Regions:
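Small-residue-rich helix-loop
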Residues: 222, 350-383
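Rossmann-fold dinucleotide-binding core
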Residues: 82-85, 100, 106-218, 226-250, ...
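NAD(P)+-binding Rossmann beta1-loop-alpha1 motif at the extreme N-terminus of oxidoreductases
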Residues: 1-64, 68-70, 92-96, 133-136
Length: 482
Protein backbone atom coordinates (compact mmCIF):
# COMPACT_ATOMS: atom_id res chain seq x y z
CA UNK A 1 0.00 0.00 0.00
CA UNK A 2 1.45 3.38 -1.03
CA UNK A 3 1.79 6.14 1.55
CA UNK A 4 -0.93 8.71 0.86
CA UNK A 5 -2.75 9.36 4.16
CA UNK A 6 -1.67 12.33 6.27
CA UNK A 7 -3.36 10.92 9.38
CA UNK A 8 -4.73 7.60 10.57
CA UNK A 9 -7.29 6.40 13.10
CA UNK A 10 -7.04 3.08 14.93
CA UNK A 11 -10.25 1.88 16.62
CA UNK A 12 -13.46 2.53 14.73
CA UNK A 13 -16.15 2.22 17.38
CA UNK A 14 -18.50 5.17 17.94
CA UNK A 15 -15.87 7.76 18.87
CA UNK A 16 -13.12 6.57 16.53
CA UNK A 17 -15.42 6.19 13.55
CA UNK A 18 -16.88 9.65 14.08
CA UNK A 19 -13.42 11.20 14.43
CA UNK A 20 -12.24 9.51 11.22
CA UNK A 21 -15.26 10.89 9.36
CA UNK A 22 -14.66 14.37 10.77
CA UNK A 23 -11.06 14.25 9.59
CA UNK A 24 -12.16 13.19 6.10
CA UNK A 25 -14.85 15.89 5.96
CA UNK A 26 -12.14 18.52 6.39
CA UNK A 27 -9.86 17.43 3.57
CA UNK A 28 -7.60 15.04 5.44
CA UNK A 29 -6.59 11.77 3.82
CA UNK A 30 -7.45 9.24 6.51
CA UNK A 31 -6.07 5.74 6.99
CA UNK A 32 -8.41 3.59 9.09
CA UNK A 33 -7.84 0.33 10.94
CA UNK A 34 -9.84 -1.77 13.35
CA UNK A 35 -8.81 -5.05 14.93
CA UNK A 36 -11.92 -6.68 13.46
CA UNK A 37 -12.06 -5.74 9.77
CA UNK A 38 -15.85 -5.98 9.76
CA UNK A 39 -16.08 -2.64 11.53
CA UNK A 40 -13.74 -1.09 8.94
CA UNK A 41 -15.94 -2.46 6.15
CA UNK A 42 -19.04 -1.05 7.86
CA UNK A 43 -17.47 2.41 8.03
CA UNK A 44 -16.50 2.26 4.37
CA UNK A 45 -19.89 0.94 3.22
CA UNK A 46 -21.85 3.56 5.14
CA UNK A 47 -19.54 6.57 4.98
CA UNK A 48 -16.78 5.84 2.46
CA UNK A 49 -18.11 8.47 0.06
CA UNK A 50 -17.69 11.27 2.64
CA UNK A 51 -13.98 11.77 1.97
CA UNK A 52 -10.67 10.07 1.22
CA UNK A 53 -10.28 6.94 3.34
CA UNK A 54 -7.56 4.30 3.14
CA UNK A 55 -8.86 1.13 4.82
CA UNK A 56 -6.23 -1.28 6.08
CA UNK A 57 -6.71 -4.96 6.89
CA UNK A 58 -3.55 -5.18 8.97
CA UNK A 59 -1.68 -2.79 11.22
CA UNK A 60 1.32 -3.08 8.89
CA UNK A 61 -0.83 -1.90 5.96
CA UNK A 62 -2.14 0.93 8.10
CA UNK A 63 1.34 2.18 8.99
CA UNK A 64 2.55 1.82 5.39
CA UNK A 65 -0.33 3.96 4.14
CA UNK A 66 0.74 6.95 6.27
CA UNK A 67 2.93 9.74 4.88
CA UNK A 68 6.06 10.41 6.98
CA UNK A 69 6.28 11.68 9.64
CA UNK A 70 3.37 9.38 10.37
CA UNK A 71 0.49 10.42 12.62
CA UNK A 72 -1.66 7.68 14.13
CA UNK A 73 -4.59 8.47 16.43
CA UNK A 74 -5.73 5.59 18.61
CA UNK A 75 -9.27 5.38 19.98
CA UNK A 76 -9.33 2.01 21.72
CA UNK A 77 -10.43 0.79 25.13
CA UNK A 78 -8.47 2.30 28.01
CA UNK A 79 -5.91 0.27 29.96
CA UNK A 80 -4.21 -2.83 28.59
CA UNK A 81 -5.74 -2.56 25.07
CA UNK A 82 -4.29 0.95 24.77
CA UNK A 83 -0.84 -0.18 25.93
CA UNK A 84 -0.93 -3.13 23.54
CA UNK A 85 -1.85 -0.95 20.56
CA UNK A 86 0.77 1.69 21.43
CA UNK A 87 3.47 -1.00 21.61
CA UNK A 88 2.34 -2.60 18.36
CA UNK A 89 2.41 0.72 16.52
CA UNK A 90 5.76 1.71 18.02
CA UNK A 91 7.28 -1.52 16.70
CA UNK A 92 6.23 -0.56 13.16
CA UNK A 93 6.89 3.17 13.23
CA UNK A 94 10.10 5.19 12.90
CA UNK A 95 11.74 8.03 14.85
CA UNK A 96 9.82 11.26 14.35
CA UNK A 97 6.46 9.51 13.93
CA UNK A 98 3.57 10.46 16.22
CA UNK A 99 1.20 8.28 18.24
CA UNK A 100 -1.82 10.11 19.66
CA UNK A 101 -3.92 8.55 22.42
CA UNK A 102 -7.27 10.34 22.11
CA UNK A 103 -9.07 8.18 24.66
CA UNK A 104 -9.86 8.96 28.30
CA UNK A 105 -6.53 7.96 29.82
CA UNK A 106 -5.44 8.63 33.39
CA UNK A 107 -2.67 11.23 33.11
CA UNK A 108 0.01 9.22 35.06
CA UNK A 109 -0.42 6.49 32.42
CA UNK A 110 0.13 9.11 29.73
CA UNK A 111 3.30 10.35 31.45
CA UNK A 112 4.56 6.76 31.67
CA UNK A 113 3.73 6.03 28.03
CA UNK A 114 5.28 9.26 26.76
CA UNK A 115 8.53 8.52 28.59
CA UNK A 116 8.69 5.01 27.18
CA UNK A 117 7.81 5.94 23.59
CA UNK A 118 9.98 9.06 23.42
CA UNK A 119 12.96 6.92 24.44
CA UNK A 120 12.48 5.15 21.11
CA UNK A 121 12.61 8.44 19.19
CA UNK A 122 8.87 8.62 18.58
CA UNK A 123 6.44 11.28 19.77
CA UNK A 124 3.61 10.29 22.08
CA UNK A 125 0.70 12.67 22.61
CA UNK A 126 -2.07 12.24 25.15
CA UNK A 127 -5.02 14.21 23.82
CA UNK A 128 -8.23 14.87 25.71
CA UNK A 129 -11.28 14.92 23.44
CA UNK A 130 -14.57 16.28 24.74
CA UNK A 131 -17.99 16.34 23.14
CA UNK A 132 -18.92 12.68 22.89
CA UNK A 133 -19.76 10.94 19.63
CA UNK A 134 -21.50 14.02 18.24
CA UNK A 135 -18.53 16.22 19.09
CA UNK A 136 -16.08 13.78 17.52
CA UNK A 137 -18.09 13.99 14.29
CA UNK A 138 -19.07 17.66 14.18
CA UNK A 139 -16.23 19.25 16.13
CA UNK A 140 -14.87 18.43 19.59
CA UNK A 141 -12.90 20.44 22.09
CA UNK A 142 -9.38 19.02 22.00
CA UNK A 143 -6.68 19.13 24.66
CA UNK A 144 -3.39 17.71 23.30
CA UNK A 145 -0.26 17.36 25.40
CA UNK A 146 3.11 16.13 24.16
CA UNK A 147 6.12 17.88 22.70
CA UNK A 148 6.19 21.23 20.91
CA UNK A 149 7.64 19.45 17.87
CA UNK A 150 4.69 17.06 17.63
CA UNK A 151 2.28 19.99 17.96
CA UNK A 152 3.72 21.57 14.79
CA UNK A 153 2.52 18.53 12.84
CA UNK A 154 -0.77 18.07 14.69
CA UNK A 155 -1.84 21.73 14.81
CA UNK A 156 -3.26 22.02 11.25
CA UNK A 157 -4.92 18.60 11.51
CA UNK A 158 -6.57 19.25 14.86
CA UNK A 159 -7.54 22.83 14.02
CA UNK A 160 -9.32 21.53 10.92
CA UNK A 161 -11.64 19.28 12.93
CA UNK A 162 -12.06 21.06 16.28
CA UNK A 163 -15.22 22.92 17.21
CA UNK A 164 -15.21 26.65 16.53
CA UNK A 165 -16.16 29.31 19.08
CA UNK A 166 -16.41 32.85 17.76
CA UNK A 167 -14.37 31.68 14.78
CA UNK A 168 -11.52 30.25 16.87
CA UNK A 169 -10.74 26.49 16.86
CA UNK A 170 -11.32 24.88 20.25
CA UNK A 171 -7.89 23.29 20.48
CA UNK A 172 -4.56 24.41 21.87
CA UNK A 173 -1.32 22.76 22.93
CA UNK A 174 -1.84 22.26 26.67
CA UNK A 175 1.66 21.30 27.76
CA UNK A 176 4.18 18.47 27.93
CA UNK A 177 3.54 14.73 28.45
CA UNK A 178 0.35 14.22 30.52
CA UNK A 179 -0.87 17.84 30.59
CA UNK A 180 -3.57 17.30 27.97
CA UNK A 181 -5.15 14.32 29.68
CA UNK A 182 -4.86 16.09 33.04
CA UNK A 183 -6.83 19.10 31.80
CA UNK A 184 -9.42 16.80 30.22
CA UNK A 185 -9.73 14.97 33.55
CA UNK A 186 -10.40 18.23 35.39
CA UNK A 187 -12.86 19.25 32.66
CA UNK A 188 -14.79 16.08 33.44
CA UNK A 189 -14.60 16.76 37.18
CA UNK A 190 -16.12 20.21 36.65
CA UNK A 191 -18.75 18.53 34.49
CA UNK A 192 -19.68 16.27 37.41
CA UNK A 193 -20.11 19.29 39.68
CA UNK A 194 -22.10 21.22 37.07
CA UNK A 195 -24.50 18.31 36.59
CA UNK A 196 -24.95 17.73 40.32
CA UNK A 197 -25.74 21.41 40.92
CA UNK A 198 -28.33 21.30 38.14
CA UNK A 199 -29.81 18.11 39.61
CA UNK A 200 -30.05 19.71 43.06
CA UNK A 201 -31.77 22.74 41.50
CA UNK A 202 -34.26 20.39 39.85
CA UNK A 203 -34.88 18.56 43.12
CA UNK A 204 -35.53 21.79 45.00
CA UNK A 205 -38.20 22.70 42.46
CA UNK A 206 -39.61 19.18 42.02
CA UNK A 207 -39.89 18.10 45.64
CA UNK A 208 -39.54 21.42 47.41
CA UNK A 209 -41.91 23.47 45.27
CA UNK A 210 -44.04 20.65 43.84
CA UNK A 211 -43.45 21.69 40.23
CA UNK A 212 -43.87 19.32 37.28
CA UNK A 213 -40.89 18.35 35.11
CA UNK A 214 -42.34 20.40 32.23
CA UNK A 215 -42.67 23.47 34.46
CA UNK A 216 -39.09 23.05 35.65
CA UNK A 217 -38.01 22.60 32.02
CA UNK A 218 -39.58 25.99 31.27
CA UNK A 219 -37.55 27.50 34.13
CA UNK A 220 -34.31 26.06 32.73
CA UNK A 221 -35.20 27.43 29.29
CA UNK A 222 -35.49 30.89 30.82
CA UNK A 223 -32.27 30.43 32.78
CA UNK A 224 -30.49 29.61 29.52
CA UNK A 225 -31.17 33.20 28.43
CA UNK A 226 -29.13 34.49 31.40
CA UNK A 227 -25.51 34.19 32.51
CA UNK A 228 -26.24 30.46 33.01
CA UNK A 229 -26.42 30.00 29.22
CA UNK A 230 -24.72 26.64 28.62
CA UNK A 231 -25.01 23.28 26.91
CA UNK A 232 -25.93 21.47 30.13
CA UNK A 233 -28.72 23.94 31.00
CA UNK A 234 -30.02 23.64 27.44
CA UNK A 235 -30.18 19.84 27.43
CA UNK A 236 -31.64 19.80 30.95
CA UNK A 237 -34.69 21.66 29.63
CA UNK A 238 -35.01 19.14 26.80
CA UNK A 239 -34.76 16.14 29.13
CA UNK A 240 -37.39 17.60 31.46
CA UNK A 241 -39.79 18.30 28.58
CA UNK A 242 -39.45 14.77 27.20
CA UNK A 243 -42.63 12.69 27.53
CA UNK A 244 -42.45 8.89 27.49
CA UNK A 245 -44.33 7.64 24.43
CA UNK A 246 -45.35 4.39 26.12
CA UNK A 247 -46.97 5.86 29.22
CA UNK A 248 -47.48 9.55 28.51
CA UNK A 249 -45.57 10.36 31.69
CA UNK A 250 -42.51 12.61 32.02
CA UNK A 251 -39.51 10.50 31.01
CA UNK A 252 -37.42 11.76 33.96
CA UNK A 253 -39.95 10.21 36.36
CA UNK A 254 -39.40 6.80 34.75
CA UNK A 255 -35.59 6.82 34.76
CA UNK A 256 -34.04 4.84 37.64
CA UNK A 257 -32.30 7.31 39.95
CA UNK A 258 -28.87 5.67 39.87
CA UNK A 259 -26.27 7.94 38.20
CA UNK A 260 -23.40 6.07 36.57
CA UNK A 261 -19.80 7.19 36.18
CA UNK A 262 -16.76 6.08 34.20
CA UNK A 263 -14.03 7.19 36.57
CA UNK A 264 -12.77 10.60 35.44
CA UNK A 265 -14.58 12.39 38.27
CA UNK A 266 -13.03 9.98 40.74
CA UNK A 267 -9.59 10.58 39.21
CA UNK A 268 -10.08 14.34 39.60
CA UNK A 269 -10.84 13.97 43.30
CA UNK A 270 -8.08 11.42 43.95
CA UNK A 271 -5.54 13.67 42.24
CA UNK A 272 -6.77 16.72 44.15
CA UNK A 273 -6.30 14.81 47.40
CA UNK A 274 -2.73 13.90 46.46
CA UNK A 275 -2.05 17.57 45.59
CA UNK A 276 -3.81 18.80 48.77
CA UNK A 277 -6.19 20.92 46.67
CA UNK A 278 -9.78 21.23 47.95
CA UNK A 279 -12.25 20.46 45.15
CA UNK A 280 -15.23 20.09 47.46
CA UNK A 281 -17.95 20.65 44.86
CA UNK A 282 -16.49 18.05 42.52
CA UNK A 283 -15.95 15.59 45.38
CA UNK A 284 -19.54 15.91 46.59
CA UNK A 285 -20.79 15.40 43.04
CA UNK A 286 -18.84 12.14 42.82
CA UNK A 287 -20.08 11.00 46.24
CA UNK A 288 -23.68 11.91 45.32
CA UNK A 289 -23.50 9.57 42.32
CA UNK A 290 -22.08 6.90 44.60
CA UNK A 291 -24.94 7.32 47.07
CA UNK A 292 -27.51 7.22 44.27
CA UNK A 293 -26.20 3.78 43.31
CA UNK A 294 -26.34 2.36 46.86
CA UNK A 295 -29.70 0.77 46.09
CA UNK A 296 -29.81 -1.71 48.98
CA UNK A 297 -28.66 0.85 51.53
CA UNK A 298 -31.21 3.41 50.38
CA UNK A 299 -33.99 0.83 50.38
CA UNK A 300 -33.14 -0.18 53.94
CA UNK A 301 -33.11 3.49 54.98
CA UNK A 302 -36.66 3.81 53.65
CA UNK A 303 -37.72 0.83 55.77
CA UNK A 304 -36.15 2.41 58.86
CA UNK A 305 -38.61 5.29 58.60
CA UNK A 306 -36.26 7.95 59.94
CA UNK A 307 -37.99 11.03 61.32
CA UNK A 308 -37.58 14.30 59.45
CA UNK A 309 -39.27 16.77 57.11
CA UNK A 310 -40.62 15.57 53.75
CA UNK A 311 -38.98 18.24 51.63
CA UNK A 312 -42.07 20.33 50.90
CA UNK A 313 -41.43 24.06 51.33
CA UNK A 314 -45.11 25.15 51.27
CA UNK A 315 -44.56 28.57 49.73
CA UNK A 316 -47.18 30.87 48.23
CA UNK A 317 -46.91 31.95 44.60
CA UNK A 318 -44.85 35.09 45.29
CA UNK A 319 -42.52 33.26 47.68
CA UNK A 320 -42.19 30.45 45.13
CA UNK A 321 -41.19 32.88 42.39
CA UNK A 322 -38.63 34.51 44.67
CA UNK A 323 -37.19 31.15 45.71
CA UNK A 324 -36.76 30.05 42.09
CA UNK A 325 -34.65 33.17 41.58
CA UNK A 326 -32.70 32.28 44.74
CA UNK A 327 -31.97 28.85 43.26
CA UNK A 328 -30.73 30.45 40.04
CA UNK A 329 -28.41 32.74 41.95
CA UNK A 330 -27.16 29.87 44.12
CA UNK A 331 -26.55 27.75 41.04
CA UNK A 332 -24.44 30.46 39.42
CA UNK A 333 -22.41 31.11 42.58
CA UNK A 334 -21.77 27.39 43.11
CA UNK A 335 -20.84 26.96 39.46
CA UNK A 336 -18.24 29.71 39.81
CA UNK A 337 -16.80 27.90 42.84
CA UNK A 338 -16.61 24.62 40.89
CA UNK A 339 -14.64 26.25 38.08
CA UNK A 340 -12.42 28.10 40.56
CA UNK A 341 -11.60 24.81 42.28
CA UNK A 342 -10.96 23.05 38.97
CA UNK A 343 -8.61 25.74 37.70
CA UNK A 344 -6.86 25.76 41.07
CA UNK A 345 -6.19 22.05 40.66
CA UNK A 346 -4.76 22.66 37.19
CA UNK A 347 -2.52 25.46 38.50
CA UNK A 348 -1.22 23.32 41.36
CA UNK A 349 -0.55 20.33 39.10
CA UNK A 350 1.24 22.52 36.56
CA UNK A 351 3.70 23.56 39.26
CA UNK A 352 4.08 19.98 40.47
CA UNK A 353 4.71 18.47 37.02
CA UNK A 354 6.49 21.38 35.33
CA UNK A 355 3.75 22.18 32.83
CA UNK A 356 3.35 25.64 31.35
CA UNK A 357 -0.44 25.77 30.97
CA UNK A 358 -2.20 28.85 29.60
CA UNK A 359 -5.41 28.94 31.67
CA UNK A 360 -6.99 31.61 29.48
CA UNK A 361 -6.46 29.36 26.45
CA UNK A 362 -7.97 26.40 28.32
CA UNK A 363 -11.09 28.46 29.05
CA UNK A 364 -11.30 29.51 25.40
CA UNK A 365 -11.16 25.98 24.02
CA UNK A 366 -13.92 24.92 26.42
CA UNK A 367 -16.32 27.44 24.84
CA UNK A 368 -17.30 25.05 22.05
CA UNK A 369 -17.59 21.35 21.36
CA UNK A 370 -17.30 20.17 24.96
CA UNK A 371 -19.93 19.22 27.54
CA UNK A 372 -19.24 22.16 29.87
CA UNK A 373 -19.33 24.80 27.13
CA UNK A 374 -20.92 27.90 28.58
CA UNK A 375 -21.32 31.61 27.96
CA UNK A 376 -19.39 32.61 31.06
CA UNK A 377 -16.19 30.92 29.85
CA UNK A 378 -15.52 34.16 27.97
CA UNK A 379 -15.48 35.89 31.36
CA UNK A 380 -13.12 33.25 32.75
CA UNK A 381 -10.75 33.63 29.81
CA UNK A 382 -10.73 37.42 30.22
CA UNK A 383 -10.04 37.09 33.96
CA UNK A 384 -6.98 34.91 33.35
CA UNK A 385 -5.73 37.05 30.46
CA UNK A 386 -5.86 40.18 32.62
CA UNK A 387 -4.17 38.47 35.56
CA UNK A 388 -7.18 39.15 37.80
CA UNK A 389 -7.69 35.42 38.42
CA UNK A 390 -4.04 34.49 38.96
CA UNK A 391 -4.62 33.57 42.62
CA UNK A 392 -8.23 32.42 42.31
CA UNK A 393 -11.07 32.92 39.87
CA UNK A 394 -13.15 34.07 42.83
CA UNK A 395 -10.93 37.13 43.24
CA UNK A 396 -11.50 38.48 39.72
CA UNK A 397 -13.80 41.53 40.03
CA UNK A 398 -16.58 40.15 37.81
CA UNK A 399 -16.80 36.87 39.72
CA UNK A 400 -16.32 38.51 43.12
CA UNK A 401 -19.28 40.75 42.31
CA UNK A 402 -21.35 37.79 41.10
CA UNK A 403 -20.67 35.89 44.33
CA UNK A 404 -21.54 38.90 46.48
CA UNK A 405 -24.76 39.47 44.52
CA UNK A 406 -25.79 35.83 44.97
CA UNK A 407 -24.69 35.39 48.59
CA UNK A 408 -28.01 35.91 50.39
CA UNK A 409 -29.89 33.75 47.88
CA UNK A 410 -27.19 31.08 48.17
CA UNK A 411 -27.51 30.96 51.96
CA UNK A 412 -31.31 30.94 51.77
CA UNK A 413 -31.29 27.95 49.41
CA UNK A 414 -28.88 25.90 51.52
CA UNK A 415 -30.65 26.77 54.79
CA UNK A 416 -34.16 26.05 53.49
CA UNK A 417 -33.01 22.80 51.94
CA UNK A 418 -31.45 21.64 55.22
CA UNK A 419 -34.46 22.66 57.32
CA UNK A 420 -36.84 20.84 54.98
CA UNK A 421 -34.84 17.65 54.44
CA UNK A 422 -33.65 18.19 50.87
CA UNK A 423 -30.04 17.06 50.24
CA UNK A 424 -27.89 19.70 48.52
CA UNK A 425 -24.32 18.44 48.98
CA UNK A 426 -22.87 20.41 46.05
CA UNK A 427 -24.61 23.67 46.97
CA UNK A 428 -23.71 23.33 50.65
CA UNK A 429 -20.08 22.33 50.11
CA UNK A 430 -19.54 25.19 47.67
CA UNK A 431 -20.95 27.68 50.17
CA UNK A 432 -18.80 26.20 52.94
CA UNK A 433 -15.71 26.51 50.74
CA UNK A 434 -16.53 30.18 50.16
CA UNK A 435 -17.06 30.77 53.87
CA UNK A 436 -13.84 28.94 54.66
CA UNK A 437 -11.93 31.25 52.32
CA UNK A 438 -13.42 34.39 53.80
CA UNK A 439 -12.91 33.34 57.44
CA UNK A 440 -10.02 35.17 59.08
CA UNK A 441 -9.43 32.23 61.44
CA UNK A 442 -10.41 28.59 61.03
CA UNK A 443 -10.83 25.83 63.65
CA UNK A 444 -7.79 24.10 62.14
CA UNK A 445 -5.89 25.53 65.13
CA UNK A 446 -7.70 23.04 67.37
CA UNK A 447 -7.00 20.19 64.96
CA UNK A 448 -3.29 20.99 64.99
CA UNK A 449 -3.39 21.07 68.79
CA UNK A 450 -4.99 17.63 68.81
CA UNK A 451 -2.35 16.34 66.38
CA UNK A 452 0.37 17.63 68.66
CA UNK A 453 -1.31 15.97 71.67
CA UNK A 454 -1.52 12.44 70.28
CA UNK A 455 1.30 12.46 67.73
CA UNK A 456 3.76 15.21 68.68
CA UNK A 457 3.26 16.71 65.22
CA UNK A 458 4.13 20.21 66.54
CA UNK A 459 2.40 23.48 65.75
CA UNK A 460 3.27 27.05 64.87
CA UNK A 461 2.30 30.08 66.93
CA UNK A 462 0.70 33.31 65.74
CA UNK A 463 2.96 35.43 67.94
CA UNK A 464 6.44 34.09 67.18
CA UNK A 465 8.28 32.08 64.49
CA UNK A 466 9.29 28.43 64.77
CA UNK A 467 7.70 25.04 65.47
CA UNK A 468 6.56 24.06 68.98
CA UNK A 469 5.43 21.04 70.95
CA UNK A 470 3.65 20.87 74.29
CA UNK A 471 4.75 18.06 76.63
CA UNK A 472 1.17 16.91 77.13
CA UNK A 473 2.00 13.80 79.19
CA UNK A 474 4.01 15.72 81.79
CA UNK A 475 2.37 17.39 84.79
CA UNK A 476 3.58 20.89 83.96
CA UNK A 477 2.79 20.62 80.23
CA UNK A 478 5.71 22.81 79.31
CA UNK A 479 6.07 24.01 75.74
CA UNK A 480 9.33 23.33 73.94
CA UNK A 481 10.67 24.52 70.61
CA UNK A 482 10.84 21.64 68.18
Amino acid sequence: MSAEANVGVVGLAAMGGSLARNLAHHGNKVAVFNRSYGRTEKLMNEHGSEGEFFPAKTLEEFVDSLVKPRTAIIMVKAGEPTDAMINALADLMEPGDIIVDAGNAYFPDTIRREKKISARGLHFVGCGVSGGEEGALLGPSMMPGGSEESWKTLKPIFESIAAKAEGEPCVTHIGLNGAGHFVKMVHNGIEYSDMQLIAESYDLMRRGLGMTPAEIGDVFEEWNKTELDSYLIEITAEVLHQVDKKTGKPLVDLIVDHAGMKGTGTWTVQTALSLAVPVTGIAEAVFARGLSSEADLREEAQKQGFAGPNGELNLNSEEKKAFIEDIRQALYASKIVAYAQGFNEITTAAKEYGWDIDLAAVARIWRGGCIIRAKFLNRISEAFESGEANVSLLFAPYFKNAIETAEKSWRNVVARAALNGLPTPAFASSLSYFDGLRSKRLPAALIQGQRDYFGAHTYQRVDQPGAFHTLWAEPGREEIEA
